[in-house]
Curated annotation (Swiss-Prot):
It holds the Pfam family Thioredoxin. It comes from the Eukaryota. Its main location: plastid. The active site is at residues 117, 120. Residues 21-34 have a biased composition (Pro residues). This is Thioredoxin-like 4, chloroplastic. Disulfide bonds join 117-120. Residues 1-20, 42-53 have a biased composition (Low complexity).
Amino acid sequence: MITASLLPLPATSSSSGRRSLPPPTTTFPRPPPPLRRHRHLSSSSSSASSTESDGGGGSTNGSLPGLPPVVVEEEEEEFCPVECVTEFKTEEELARVLERAKATGALVVVDFFRPSCGSCKYIEQGFMKLCKGSGDHGSSVVFLKHNVIDEYDEQSEVADRLRIKVVPLFHFYKNGVLLEAFATRDKERIIAAIQKYTAPSSPPAESEEPSQEG
């Protein structure tokens, strides 16, 4: 009894010596990869190859070969908190700060600025860094700032009273007295002035008594 087999039959030779060919199979074309994915891989591979070439064949940013490089964000230098540089708007506010500073012997540094001033924006970052590091030197320094343009886009009463004509301008007060004022965008000049007015006073030199000969 002959039963039907579900397995393919092996190729047999015909009587004429030719092998019988297997039945033709239908093949379907492979769909191309998505264009967006292709661009992502190519850009990733190029980024990885450029990173490897720069780092001597290895990844310099922690990414594995063949994978997109890890983007490492540079840590920005930490600035002082907002309350470190206090902004005042009226002459009365400035007077209160100067009075408190007089009681503690602190130096008061005031930055007069204008929002549209490029040099003011430039020195602002350095001024904030000075404020943040002021406690490291053991000296008491109070940092203030004042916008010379009021909400009506006119010169403020404080700027008018103090005759502020140029910005950025820095005032240095101690014991309620204005010691120095100058316009600058040089942080080193501000540092020099702070050090000058916060340096401990040197003790007076002891006078030598003339030796008495007996």
